[in-house]
Amino acid sequence: MDTSPITARSLQKPYHIKADEFERAYKDFLSGYRTWKELSHAEDWLVFYKNIGPQLSIDETALSDGELYTIISNKAAHGGKGAIVAIIKGTKVEDVVKALMRILWYERAKVLEVTMDFSESMHSIVKQCFPYATITIDRFHVQKDCYDAMQQVRIR
C-alpha cells in the first residue's frame, strides 16, 4: 500500500479523469468540507481545546500575503499530531483573547507555562487567558538580544 500523498492531477492521466472536476467533487462532496462545523469561522480562528496541555508556546507568523496569525501550540506534541491548540487571524489582543476564551476556564487553568517572545501583546494575551501560567521567554530571543547588545558595546 502506498502511503505517500497524491494529487488529483496525478490521477488525471492513468484514470482518464479531469483533475479540476475531480478536485471540485472531492472538496464539495467526498471530503465533508461543506458540512464541516468549523467552516463558518475557520478563516478567522480555529481552536482545538483537546490539544491543550501544561506547557504551551505562543507566537505570531505570516502565512501568506503578509497576513499575520497567532499560533498557540502544545510543546509536549513536539510539532506533531495534537500540537496546534489555536490558530487565530491577526495579533490584536482582543481578537486572540476572544478566540481563546472559547476554551473552558478549567482547561485554561491547567496551563502552567507559556513560552513566548518579548511581545507586549503576547504577554497580555497570556495573562488574560492563562492566569496560572508562568511566562518563559524563548531562548532564541534572549540570545538574539544579548548578541545585539554585545555588538552595540563592541561598536562603541
Please provide the spans of the model-predicted regions.
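RNase H-like nuclease fold core
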Residues: 23-128, 132
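Short, basic interhelical loop/turn and adjoining N-cap
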Residues: 7-28
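Short, amphipathic alpha-helical "recognition" segments used to contact nucleic acids or chromatin
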Residues: 1-6
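Conserved beta-strand -> loop -> alpha-helix junction used to position metal-binding or nucleic-acid-contacting
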Residues: 117-120, 126-156
